[in-house]
Amino acid sequence: MSDINATRLPGMEPPSPMPCVGDADNFTLTRG
């Protein structure tokens, strides 16, 4: 899921502080 986060939010830091939140947001946006 690192690639998704990096592609979605390149400006934000890597998924360390809140990987779940980032993943969820990306999943929701990607899935719809």
From Swiss-Prot:
<comment type="similarity">
    <text>Belongs to the MSDIN fungal toxin family.</text>
</comment>
<feature type="propeptide">
    <location>
        <begin position="20"/>
        <end position="32"/>
    </location>
</feature>
<keyword id="KW-0800">Toxin</keyword>
<dbReference type="InterPro" id="IPR027582">
    <property type="entry name" value="Amanitin/phalloidin"/>
</dbReference>
<feature type="cross-link" description="Cyclopeptide (Gly-Pro)">
    <location>
        <begin position="11"/>
        <end position="19"/>
    </location>
</feature>
<dbReference type="GO" id="GO:0090729">
    <property type="term" value="F:toxin activity"/>
</dbReference>
<feature type="propeptide">
    <location>
        <begin position="1"/>
        <end position="10"/>
    </location>
</feature>
<protein>
    <recommendedName>
        <fullName>MSDIN-like toxin proprotein 11</fullName>
    </recommendedName>
</protein>
<comment type="function">
    <text>Probable toxin that belongs to the MSDIN-like toxin family responsible for a large number of food poisoning cases and deaths.</text>
</comment>
<feature type="region of interest" description="Disordered">
    <location>
        <begin position="1"/>
        <end position="32"/>
    </location>
</feature>
